[in-house]
């Protein structure tokens, strides 16, 4: 499933942002909140050369072993992310501030990448091959978060980093 938040932009200098998630987010308050932030990000992004293209969801693997599940999900992710910057949400990732994450996005955009794929793994996490291929791994802390809340937090951070890069006052500065 792919939910689109903006029409595809073809202008030079724009970078597409896509969220790739293992598992489907059901209707409910978490999805409504995530969609609200993603809609805001989609409207604000073009002013700074960023297009929120949408959310790609793939079903969780039904393979028997954890290793097989992670590999199967990882292959799909790597196929999807070809040619773009790959950012993993991963418990082993770096704990970046909103401004630092925004600076990384701007760096990817300014260095010629045409797409950023933000990847949320399945319940077993990311395969080692995916971790090795990632351009950046980030974490929302050492705690374990339900996937629905991770999506809300990611959506909010995308909106926040776009507003920071747009020059809106940021209360943490």
Curated annotation (Swiss-Prot):
Keywords: Cytoplasm, Methyltransferase, rRNA processing, S-adenosyl-L-methionine, Transferase. Coiled coil: none annotated. One of its GO terms (molecular function) is rRNA (pseudouridine-N3-)-methyltransferase activity. S-adenosyl-L-methionine binds at residues 89, 121. Its main location: cytoplasm. It is found in: Cytoplasm. Gene3D superfamilies: 3.40.1280.10. CDD domains: RlmH-like. It catalyses: pseudouridine(1915) in 23S rRNA + S-adenosyl-L-methionine = N(3)-methylpseudouridine(1915) in 23S rRNA + S-adenosyl-L-homocysteine + H(+). Pfam families: SPOUT_MTase (PF02590). It comes from the Bacteria. Its EC number is 2.1.1.177. The keyword S-adenosyl-L-methionine applies. InterPro entries: Alpha/beta_knot_MTases, RlmH-like, tRNA_m1G_MTases_N. One of its GO terms (cellular component) is cytoplasm. SUPFAM superfamilies: alpha/beta knot (SSF75217). Specifically methylates the pseudouridine at position 1915 (m3Psi1915) in 23S rRNA. Homodimer. Belongs to the RNA methyltransferase RlmH family. PANTHER family: METHYLTRANSFERASE, RIBOSOMAL RNA LARGE SUBUNIT METHYLTRANSFERASE H. This is Ribosomal RNA large subunit methyltransferase H. The lineage of its organism: Bacteria, Pseudomonadati, Pseudomonadota, Alphaproteobacteria, Hyphomicrobiales. The gene is rlmH.
């Amino acid at each position: 499933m792919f939910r689109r938040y903006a029409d595809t932009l073809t202008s030079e200098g724009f970078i597409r942002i896509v969220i790739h998630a293992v598992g489907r987010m059901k209707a409910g308050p978490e999805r409504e909140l995530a969609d609200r932030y993603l809609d805001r990000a989609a409207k604000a992004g073009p002013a700074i050369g960023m297009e929120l293209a949408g959310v790609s969801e793939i079903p969780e693997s039904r393979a028997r072993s954890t290793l097989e599940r992670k590999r199967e999900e990882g292959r799909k992710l790597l196929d999807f992310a070809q040619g773009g910057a790959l950012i993993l949400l991963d418990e082993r990732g770096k704990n970046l501030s909103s401004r630092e994450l925004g600076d990384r996005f701007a760096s990817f955009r300014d260095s010629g990448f045409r797409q950023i794929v933000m990847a949320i793994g399945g319940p077993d996490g990311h395969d080692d091959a995916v971790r090795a291929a990632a351009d950046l791994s980030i974490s929302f802390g050492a705690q374990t978060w339900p996937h629905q809340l991770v999506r809300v937090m990611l959506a909010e951070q995308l909106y926040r980093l776009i507003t920071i890069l747009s020059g809106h006052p940021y209360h943490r500065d």
